[in-house]
Swiss-Prot record:
Origin superkingdom: Eukaryota
Enzyme class: oxidoreductase
Keywords for this protein: Dioxygenase, Iron, Metal-binding, Oxidoreductase
Family: Belongs to the PhyH family. PHYHD1 subfamily.
Cross-referenced InterPro entries: Phytyl_CoA_dOase-like (IPR008775)
UniProt-recorded Gene Ontology molecular function terms: dioxygenase activity; metal ion binding
Protein name (database record): Phytanoyl-CoA dioxygenase domain-containing protein 1 homolog
Protein residues bound to Fe cation: 149, 151, 242
Protein task: Has alpha-ketoglutarate-dependent dioxygenase activity. Does not show detectable activity towards fatty acid CoA thioesters. Is not expected to be active with phytanoyl CoA.
Disulfide bonds, paired cysteine numbers: none
TM helices/strands, residue ranges: none
E.C. numbers: 1.-.-.-
Organism: Caenorhabditis elegans
């Protein structure tokens, strides 16, 4: 991995091939299947996740309070106007978040894995803390697009470049099923981070979250598709611009993602939607 850091610093992302073997991928799939099968729909609001609707999560305490829980977010195309599912629940989910990495033994094992630890040592992280995890389904036919964005819009640290995402392909990710696309080198322009998703701290029944600043626009011709094989991962700088198209294929595009901050000499913004709780302090990625 001698050139991993060089590519990461140049492009703002880097593909690391074949990090997880078939057995490990199968373990994660089986674990998520059990979590979904055990979910009682009556106990969870059918919260629809959308990157297009800026007001969607504004009053959604179910989302806001999910940092130390395993919670379920549905595809727009899977819930009808009466709030009923139009497909089986295992085909209806957009994602599960945001505490899989410490609440589920399988995902904890895969997160605090020597292979992940070595990657972060390679890019120079000294005190990495895992702030969140998500399992993303990108369902066949209804898996929604994720609009162009930078992760630092949603998770802000100071210094601003002390945040990195890890995107693990549970299925092969191709152009057909909605692989990620990036603008190489876009992490060097910090102006994208002026647009932020923040807590309002409102206690009067108003919006709990809001976007501030002007939403940036990007030259769509600069995006490059980055297809990757099952078991490989993409390391994603917090300021690199990326997106994914809708999955209109017959194939699923599952992924497991985590976000990691360099805690050394770094401040976590009190405005971030995701915060530590009494039950959850960002765990050390390098823990034994």
């Amino acid at each position: 991995m001698w050139d991993l850091r060089e590519k990461f610093e140049r492009d703002g992302f880097v593909v690391v091939e074949n990090v997880f073997n078939d057995q490990e991928i199968d373990e994660m799939k089986k674990s998520i299947s059990k979590i979904v099968n055990d979910m009682d729909l009556a106990e969870h609001p059918k919260s629809v996740f959308s990157t297009y609707d800026e007001d969607k999560h504004a009053a959604d305490s179910y989302f806001l309070n999910s940092s130390d829980k395993i919670r379920f977010f549905f595809e727009e195309g899977a819930v009808d106007k009466d709030g009923e599912l139009t497909v089986p629940k295992d085909k209806a989910l957009n994602k599960i978040g945001h505490g899989l990495h410490f609440l589920d033994p399988t995902f904890e094992k895969m997160t605090f894995n020597s292979k992940i630890q070595n990657i972060f040592k390679e890019i120079g992280y000294q005190e990495p803390g895992v702030v969140q995890s998500m399992y993303i389904f990108k369902q066949p036919k209804i898996g929604g697009a994720v609009t162009d964005h930078v992760d630092s819009t949603f998770l802000r640290v100071d210094p601003i470049d002390h945040l990195t995402g890890v995107w693990i392909a549970i299925d092969e990710a191709s152009v057909e099923n909605g692989c990620l696309s990036f603008i190489p080198g876009s992490h060097k322009d910090t102006s994208s981070a002026n647009y932020r998703f923040v807590r309002t701290h409102d206690t009067s029944g108003g919006a709990l979250l809001k976007f501030i600043g002007t939403r940036p626009t990007y030259d769509q011709s600069k995006f490059q598709h980055v297809p990757i094989s099952k078991g490989s991962l993409i390391l994603i700088h917090g300021l690199v611009v990326h997106k994914s198209e809708a999955n209109t294929s017959e194939k699923s595009r599952h992924a497991y993602t985590i976000h990691v901050m360099e805690r050394k000499n770094t401040k976590w913004s009190e405005q971030n939607w995701l915060q530590e709780t009494e039950n959850y302090k960002f765990p050390d990625l390098y823990k034994d």
